[in-house]
Amino acid sequence: MDPSSKPLREIPGSYGIPFFQPIKDRLEYFYGTGGRDEYFRSRMQKYQSTVFRANMPPGPFVSSNPKVIVLLDAKSFPILFDVSKVEKKDLFTGTYMPSTKLTGGYRVLSYLDPSEPRHAQLKNLLFFMLKNSSNRVIPQFETTYTELFEGLEAELAKNGKAAFNDVGEQAAFRFLGRAYFNSNPEETKLGTSAPTLISSWVLFNLAPTLDLGLPWFLQEPLLHTFRLPAFLIKSTYNKLYDYFQSVATPVMEQAEKLGVPKDEAVHNILFAVCFNTFGGVKILFPNTLKWIGLAGENLHTQLAEEIRGAIKSYGDGNVTLEAIEQMPLTKSVVYESLRIEPPVPPQYGKAKSNFTIESHDATFEVKKGEMLFGYQPFATKDPKVFDRPEEYVPDRFVGDGEALLKYVWWSNGPETESPTVENKQCAGKDFVVLITRLFVIELFRRYDSFEIELGESPLGAAVTLTFLKRASI
């Protein structure tokens, strides 16, 4: 449909009676049949529109204004990345911002708008950290995930099954320490405590928007109505801070050159590694394992052949960037995992001025100051863009399918674009894609196939391995 021919439509939906309706909506969002997906789907069907007004949790008393304009289609969603039209200040977590007492008193990079001078300094610091670690990524990943798979094999041999998530989190943080700082955190004062420390600290940041599976009469007063006091987590946070302060010397020296005080740099490094990177991998690796596991042995055979063939022909028996580029199916299965189940479902942006947005069917007027909210799992399953959108299609992005990558937005921007100091796209976008490919590569270098069981988890999939078939060639 030509944009000029799309009818101008008033944004449907209402926010209801202040205070009472946001609480009612919060209860529906967390405890209604069908969960948050149904919260959005029912309204989309009611209003016959993928753009509508609604309240977003947490609401009272954590958030002063729960009102948002919801975007659920691939046409309207990208407005959230246009920083000329939307402001990104203090809305990383949505309609509320966690206390800066949880981040050393600083507004860390995720909460800064690109227009703020500190944004460019801190993002350049992360670019330096990524570049400085580039030569360590592949060898340290291989070392760490060989350790992981050896442990899983031993557990499987002993008990007939092996839970992936907890040991996977240990491996992920061990790898990040080795890759970024040339330091195995398990050989420091942290020991193996980092994943538990991080999860506790993240809970204090995100509690108002999390569903931990508790009964509503416990979860509502404890998590969703008032903020958890920051002082309760201070000693936990300080243990993480001390680790990064002790190992991140080259990054801190670069921070001073960029005009960022060392203390502020450490808090930002901690947030980037623990919240952004570890938090993403904690969800993404089990999800990827889940989808590939469910796809079955035929896909496993194809991946094993592609991966081993490329390593032999282009890497002289080793994993290299050149060899990885010759693995189109491997790349596609990672992108498809990121499409069908993006690790961070919500994105927000506040209108800088009056402007119009388009869905596939209509045009809508947005007023300055209104909050836009995109629920990514709907936008990346838009049936007007993707064939069989609800299915995991392993080769979706192979060949001509690469054209669809502009609709993959897990990184807070299109997969076809790159992070810069001028945008809010994830600084580690390419790093996360690379290590997820490496995860698939190490899996199929070692095994011909595997089988899994799935369980419940508040974040992502809980995966248990029930069978590992060692590589036959």
Curated annotation (Swiss-Prot):
Keyword field contains Lipid metabolism: yes
Residues engaged in binding (13S)-hydroperoxy-(9Z,11E)-octadecadienoate: S199, K282
Gene Ontology terms for molecular function: allene oxide synthase activity; heme binding; iron ion binding; monooxygenase activity; oxidoreductase activity, acting on paired donors, with incorporation or reduction of molecular oxygen
GO cellular component assignments: chloroplast envelope; chloroplast thylakoid membrane
The protein's Enzyme Commission number: 4.2.1.92
UniProt pathway: Lipid metabolism; oxylipin biosynthesis
Keywords: Fatty acid biosynthesis, Fatty acid metabolism, Heme, Iron, Lipid biosynthesis, Lipid metabolism, Lyase, Metal-binding, Oxylipin biosynthesis
Catalytic activity: (13S)-hydroperoxy-(9Z,11E,15Z)-octadecatrienoate = (9Z,13S,15Z)-12,13-epoxyoctadeca-9,11,15-trienoate + H2O; (13S)-hydroperoxy-(9Z,11E)-octadecadienoate = (9Z,13S)-12,13-epoxyoctadeca-9,11-dienoate + H2O
Cofactor(s) listed: heme b
InterPro entries linked: Cyt_P450, Cyt_P450_E_grp-IV, Cyt_P450_sf
Disulphide-bonded residues: none
Record flagged with keyword Coiled coil: no
Biological process terms in GO annotation: jasmonic acid biosynthetic process; oxylipin biosynthetic process; sterol metabolic process
Residues binding heme b: K88, H119, K123, K424, C426
Protein function: Cytochrome P450 enzyme involved in the biosynthesis of oxylipin jasmonates, important phytohormones acting as growth regulators and signaling molecules for plant defense. Functions as an allene oxide synthase that converts hydroperoxy fatty acids to unstable allene epoxides. Catalyzes the dehydration of 13-HPOTE ((13S)-hydroperoxy-(9Z,11E,15Z)-octadecatrienoate). Also catalyzes the dehydration of 13-HPODE ((13S)-hydroperoxy-(9Z,11E)-octadecadienoate).
Listed PANTHER family: CYTOCHROME P450 26, CYTOCHROME P450 SUPERFAMILY
Family of the protein in this entry: Belongs to the cytochrome P450 family.
Name this protein carries in UniProt: Allene oxide synthase CYP74A2
Organism: Parthenium argentatum
